[in-house]
């Protein structure tokens, strides 16, 4: 079983006099920086000068600096910009201003694990990764609780890397729920696998296939949309809150029997074998090489071209109409 730390076990003392530079002020940067500040840490925010994020961070009461200035001043540099800009940002602004004894901190392990960034040997390399969106990280903190985080130390140069890691987890509010020990390798491989095989790739592809099956059999697209896509959230919410068996106990008896007996016909041993192939390509670096190469060559078009194809699919055309019925004021 994984090791878990709780709030009462952790002290902020080891980092209370250290300055934390939060690099980036998107959804996670906003939430984590404000939680740290409210927990009493010395926080600066490192951003591109003059942008909308700069104004937002300043209006939230933060001292805002350029990325280079923030890294030079801080003891802990907490990197919360998108994965694919981290390497260049590190080369241009962060790396030249990171000196012995500082800590490089992340909320995702990819840049370090795949060596997009190669940290010097005389700094700590740590991770605090909340398992929820930034809005939830902030919301649960303000409610007096927190969003769990997974935590790891890749490099302990100072001997105090774990104190820094756990202190950040406490300041973010995550220790109130629990800090779960992991490794950089485990975080990125399981995170990418979940995104590809289940959460994003697998579930979206399954929904499209189910929709096509019904429409090709002569059913109305609008009805198919409701049955295979719209109602999915109800089931996922139950699974998240009550577990898989808890979901089975809360659906109709017909849904329970049909799902338990027919589900394995859809997701069978061959599906699991293909999932294994997806995992292997993550583990051996095949996917990383493909992704980085595609992004360097095509930028956002590396994935936009697939999304453009889906935009013309019937499930999206019908979906836009159905969503307008339920949320007339929403924009997509």
Swiss-Prot record:
InterPro entries: 6-PGluconate_DH-like_C_sf (IPR008927), KARI (IPR013023), KARI_C (IPR000506), KARI_N (IPR013116), KARI_prok (IPR014359), NAD(P)-bd_dom_sf (IPR036291). Mg(2+) 1 binds at residues 191, 195. NADP(+) binds at residues 25-28, 48, 53, 83-86, 134. Keywords: Amino-acid biosynthesis, Branched-chain amino acid biosynthesis, Magnesium, Metal-binding, NADP, Oxidoreductase. The keyword rRNA-binding does not apply. GO terms for molecular function: ketol-acid reductoisomerase activity; magnesium ion binding; NADP binding. Binds 2 magnesium ions per subunit. Its cofactor is Mg(2+). Its EC number is 1.1.1.86. Residues 1-182 form the KARI N-terminal Rossmann domain. Belongs to the ketol-acid reductoisomerase family. This is Ketol-acid reductoisomerase (NADP(+)). The lineage of its organism: Archaea, Nitrososphaerota, Candidatus Cenarchaeales, Candidatus Cenarchaeaceae, Candidatus Cenarchaeum. The gene is ilvC.
């Amino acid at each position: 079983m994984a090791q878990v730390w709780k709030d009462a076990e952790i002290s902020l003392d080891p980092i209370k006099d250290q300055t934390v530079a939060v690099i980036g002020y998107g959804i996670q940067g906003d939430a984590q920086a404000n939680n740290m500040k409210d927990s009493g840490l010395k926080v600066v925010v490192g951003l591109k000068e003059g942008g909308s994020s700069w104004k937002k961070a300043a209006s939230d009461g933060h001292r805002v600096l350029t990325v280079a200035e923030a890294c030079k001043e801080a003891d802990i540099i907490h990197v919360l910009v998108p994965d694919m800009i981290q390497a260049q940002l590190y080369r241009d602004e962060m790396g030249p201003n990171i000196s012995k004894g500082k800590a490089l901190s992340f909320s995702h392990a990819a840049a370090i694990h795949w060596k997009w960034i190669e940290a010097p040997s005389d700094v700590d390399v740590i991770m605090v990764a909340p398992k929820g969106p930034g809005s939830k990280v902030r919301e649960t903190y303000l409610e007096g609780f927190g969003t769990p985080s997974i935590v790891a130390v890749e490099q302990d140069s100072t001997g105090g890397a774990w104190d820094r890691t756990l202190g950040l987890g406490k300041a973010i509010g995550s220790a109130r729920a629990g800090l779960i020990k992991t490794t950089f390798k485990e975080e990125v491989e399981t995170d990418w696998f979940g995104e590809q095989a289940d959460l994003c790739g697998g579930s979206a592809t399954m929904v499209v296939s189910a929709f096509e099956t019904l429409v090709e059999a002569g059913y109305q697209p609008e009805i198919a949309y409701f049955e295979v896509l719209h109602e999915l959230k109800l089931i996922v919410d139950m699974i998240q809150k009550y577990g898989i068996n808890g979901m089975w106990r809360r659906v109709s008896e017909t849904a329970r029997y049909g799902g338990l007996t027919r589900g394995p016909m859809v997701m069978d041993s061959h599906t699991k074998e293909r999932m294994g192939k997806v995992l292997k390509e993550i583990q051996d670096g095949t996917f990383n090489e493909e992704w980085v190469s595609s992004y360097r060559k095509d930028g956002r078009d590396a994935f936009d071209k697939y999304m453009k194809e889906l935009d013309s699919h019937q499930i999206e055309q019908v979906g836009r109409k159905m969503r307008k019925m339920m949320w007339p004021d929403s924009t997509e």
